[in-house]
Structure formats: C-alpha cells, structure tokens
C-alpha cells in the first residue's frame, strides 16, 4: 500500500512522492503499523526505524510500485483495452463493454469514472483510474470471477503516475486532447 494508515503486519509500504506530501514522511508510521519493507526514492531520508525493515531504493517509486503490485496480484483479464483522452473515456469504455456483450462475449467489464461494471457486478469508484494497488487488486478480482475482457479508462493523471504499469494492455485508444488538466500537466 501507499497509504501508511492501511499498513498491516507484513505489508510493503510504498513511500510515493506527491504534489502536496512526500510518502517518505510516513515511513516510521508504516513501520509502526507492521510494514516489513519500504519502497523509497533513492534520495529519500530514512528514519532510524528503517534499519529494522527491508528498504528498496529506486529512482522511480511509482513505476516500481505498479510493477510490484502487478506481480503480487498476478491475475488480470485476458484482454484489456485502455482508453485515454480529455473527454469521451467513460462513453468509450461503456460502448466497448456493450459491443462485446452484444457479440456474445458476456465475460466483459468496464472500469473507470462510473466504477466497475460487469454482469452481476456494480462497484462505484472514486477515481477515473484507481490508485496503483487498488487497480491491480481490481484486475485480479475481475479475472478471478471469470472476466476475460476489460475496457478501462486511463486518465492522464493515472498514466503520468504509472498506475497502469504492469497491466497487460492489448489495445490503447485515444479519444481527443484539449486544454483541460493544464493545472496538473502544465503544457500540452
């Protein structure tokens, strides 16, 4: 997990850099809650308690955390379509799921702004592209219940933060590009 409040005994804590907070500030808290390993940026300052756990230093904590999460959760739907763009992602993944279903592929799902939608499954989400650990857990959960085809939204934030790294995407689709989210990306 990348949230020190969710750490339990035996967990890996990913100390991710953020725009407002740096996860390395929460390493001691994560260790107190039972983390046995921490993933940190190679230049991070470590608390004294870090000597008691495995420390993995890297130049890209977000990318490496996604790769670790994909290895930990292992299972993924056989076919994944990721859709990005300023607008139209939600409609596009919904259309893809509907087209699969109409063509006889009933083991299909969509994941994004509206949450997760599949036959017999409806879970609401908080982010267009879930955080890294949640995304890879969701991919594994969907595969475990027999979902073979997934259309998912890939937000620009999610892509920039490497949340989808480790996901076995077969097809990537781009809807459009406009000036939205320049507060985050700064330029086009």
Predicted regions and their residues:
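Phosphate-binding loop of NTP-binding sites
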Residues: 64-188
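N-terminal leader/targeting and accessory segments in enzymes
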Residues: 1-67, 71
